[in-house]
C-alpha cells in the first residue's frame, strides 16, 4: 500500500436552495396569498478521524470534493430538502490547514473526532416570508447562499509515545522488532525503512505504549540529502525520543560523529523538538569487546556533552531492552501524573508542543515553497491563481506536496 502523509485538496460545501415564488390557486379562491417555500440548506463538508486508516492515499487521486446542493423551495409552502453533508475519513493524527492563509483549522487526534471544514450555504427565502399587511402578494424571493469553498492541506503525523531517531542502519527497526510485535523490514543496507512503522510495547498485561520508527537521517538531510527531514514531523507528538547510535558500524566510522550528525539535523529541523526529553541508546553492544565498548560509549557522551539517561543495549540479542522498556513505561506514567497534578508543568509542555508544531510546519512549508520555485518559478504556492495551481495530471506530478513510498 502506498504511504501518503501530505495531500492538498479542494472542498466545496453545497449551495443553498433558492426560495420559491408561488401563489395559492384553488377553485373559488382566485386571489390566494403567497405560498412559496424556502430552499434547503446546502450540505457541509466534515472530516472524521478513522482509526482504521493509516494513509492519505485516497485523496491523492481525488482532490475535489463537493457536498450536495440544497433543493429549491416549492409551492404550497414546501421547504426544499437540505443537501447531504459530505464526510471525509482521514487517519487519526491528521492536521487540517487552510492552504491560502496557513491557518490550522483543526487537529484530528481522537478516533471519531469530527471537524467541519466547509459550511453549507444558507437557504433562500420563499415569497411567503415577505407577506405583510401592506404587501399581500409579494413577488420577492432570495437565492440560496453559495457554499464555502476552501483549498486545504492535510498533514498526517503518526501518534506515538516514543520516537526513534538515528542514522540508517543504527538498528532502529531491529529494536522495534525486539520490543514489540511489529515486523518492519530489516536489512544490511541503508534506508531499509522508507515509511514510519508503529509498534506496541507491552510491559505487562495492563501496561503498554506505542513506539514509532522513522526512516534514518544522514548528514545534510535538512538540505534534502537522503530522504530529507520530512519524516521528523512524525516525532512532533511523541513524549520522549530515543536517539539510537550504532557503536559498531560496519564502515568503522566514528559513533560520536554519527551521534553529532543526528543532533545537528534535529536542531536544524526544530530547535524546540531538540528540547524534547531525549534518551541516548547505544546499540550493538554485543559486537565489540567490553573495553572497547566502554571507550566508545564514553566518547559519544563526551562529544555530545550528554547529561541525560544513557542505555547500552543489543537490540538483536535483546540485551538491555527489557530494562529500557520498563524505564520508558515508568517515565510515561510519571509524566502523566505530573501533567495531571502540576499546572505549571502542563503549561510548560503545552508551550513546547505548540512551538514544535509551529517550527515543523514552517520548515515543511519552506521545503514546499522551494520545490515550487524550482518547478514553476513561482515564489510560493499561494501566488498561483485560483485554478492554475490544480494539476490533474497526477502521474507526472512527482514534485507535489505529497510524499509517497511503498509499504512492503
From Swiss-Prot:
Task: Please name the GO terms of the biological process aspect recorded for this protein, alphabetically.
Answer: ribosome biogenesis
**What InterPro entries would the database entry show?**
G_OBG (IPR031167), GTP-bd (IPR006073), GTP-bd_Obg/CgtA (IPR014100), GTP1-OBG_CS (IPR006074), GTP1_OBG_dom (IPR006169), GTP1_OBG_dom_sf (IPR036726), OBG_GTPase (IPR045086), P-loop_NTPase (IPR027417)
Give the record's GO CC terms. cytoplasm
Protein's cellular compartments: Cytoplasm
**Ranges annotated as biased composition (Acidic residues):** 385-401
Task: Please report the stretch or stretches of sequence annotated as the OBG-type G domain.
Answer: 160-333
Query: Which PROSITE patterns does the protein's record reference?
Result: G_OBG (PS51710), GTP1_OBG (PS00905), OBG (PS51883)
**Matching Gene3D superfamilies, A to Z?**
GTP1/OBG domain, P-loop containing nucleotide triphosphate hydrolases
Protein family (similarity comment): Belongs to the TRAFAC class OBG-HflX-like GTPase superfamily. OBG GTPase family.
What does this protein do, in the record's words?
A: An essential GTPase which binds GTP, GDP and possibly (p)ppGpp with moderate affinity, with high nucleotide exchange rates and a fairly low GTP hydrolysis rate. Plays a role in control of the cell cycle, stress response, ribosome biogenesis and in those bacteria that undergo differentiation, in morphogenesis control.
Q: What's the name of the protein?
A: GTPase Obg
Q: Which organism is it from?
A: Pseudomonas putida (strain ATCC 47054 / DSM 6125 / CFBP 8728 / NCIMB 11950 / KT2440)
Native organism taxonomy: Bacteria, Pseudomonadati, Pseudomonadota, Gammaproteobacteria, Pseudomonadales
The gene behind this protein is obg
Amino acid at each position: 500500500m502506498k504511504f501518503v502523509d501530505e495531500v492538498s485538496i479542494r472542498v466545496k460545501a453545497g449551495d443553498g436552495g433558492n426560495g420559491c415564488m408561488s401563489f395559492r390557486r384553488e377553485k373559488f379562491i382566485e386571489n390566494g396569498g403567497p405560498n412559496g417555500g424556502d430552499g434547503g440548506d446546502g450540505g457541509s463538508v466534515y472530516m472524521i478521524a478513522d482509526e482504521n486508516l493509516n494513509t492519505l492515499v485516497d485523496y491523492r487521486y481525488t482532490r475535489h470534493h463537493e457536498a450536495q446542493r440544497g433543493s429549491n423551495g416549492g409551492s404550497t409552502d414546501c421547504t426544499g430538502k437540505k443537501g447531504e453533508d459530505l464526510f471525509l475519513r482521514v487517519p487519526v493524527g491528521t492536521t487540517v490547514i487552510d492552504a491560502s492563509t496557513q491557518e490550522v483549522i483543526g487537529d484530528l487526534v481522537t478516533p471519531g473526532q469530527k471537524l467541519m471544514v466547509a459550511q453549507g450555504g444558507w437557504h433562500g427565502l420563499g415569497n411567503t416570508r415577505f407577506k405583510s399587511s401592506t404587501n399581500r402578494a409579494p413577488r420577492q424571493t432570495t437565492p440560496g447562499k453559495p457554499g464555502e469553498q476552501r483549498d486545504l492541506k492535510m498533514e498526517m503525523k503518526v501518534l506515538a509515545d516514543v520516537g526513534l531517531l538515528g542514522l540508517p542502519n543504527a538498528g532502529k527497526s531491529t529494536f522495534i522488532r525486539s520490543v514489540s510485535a511489529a515486523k518492519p523490514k530489516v536489512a544490511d543496507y541503508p534506508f531499509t525503512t522508507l515509511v514510519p512503522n508503529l509498534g506496541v510495547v507491552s510491559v505487562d498485561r495492563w501496561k503498554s505504549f506505542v513506539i514509532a520508527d522513522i526512516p534514518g537521517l544522514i548528514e545534510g538531510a535538512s538540505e534534502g540529502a537522503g530522504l530529507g527531514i520530512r519524516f521528523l514531523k512524525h516525532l512532533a507528538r511523541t513524549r520522549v525520543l530515543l536517539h539510537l547510535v550504532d557503536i559498531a558500524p560496519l564502515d568503522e566510522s566514528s559513533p560520536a560523529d554519527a551521534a553529532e550528525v543526528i543532533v545537528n539535523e534535529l536542531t536544524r529541523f526544530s530547535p524546540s523538538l531538540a528540547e524534547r526529553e531525549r534518551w541516548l541508546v547505544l546499540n550493538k553492544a554485543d559486537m565489540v569487546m567490553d573495553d572497547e565498548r566502554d571507550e566508545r560509549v564514553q566518547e559519544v557522551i563526551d562529544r555530545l556533552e550528554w547529561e541525560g539517561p544513557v542505555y547500552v543495549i543489543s537490540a538483536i540479542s535483546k540485551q538491555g531492552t527489557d530494562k529500557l522498556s520498563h524505564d520508558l513505561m515508568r517515565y510515561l506514567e510519571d509524566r502523566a501524573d505530573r501533567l495531571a497534578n502540576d499546572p505549571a508543568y502542563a503549561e510548560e509542555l503545552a508551550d513546547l508542543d505548540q512551538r514544535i508544531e509551529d517550527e515543523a510546519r514552517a520548515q515543511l512549508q519552506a521545503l514546499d515553497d522551494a520545490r515550487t520555485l524550482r518547478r514553476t518559478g513561482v515564489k510560493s504556492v499561494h501566488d498561483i491563481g485560483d485554478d492554475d495551481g490544480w494539476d490533474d495530471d497526477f502521474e507526472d506530478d512527482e514534485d507535489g506536496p505529497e510524499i509517497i513510498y511503498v509499504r512492503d
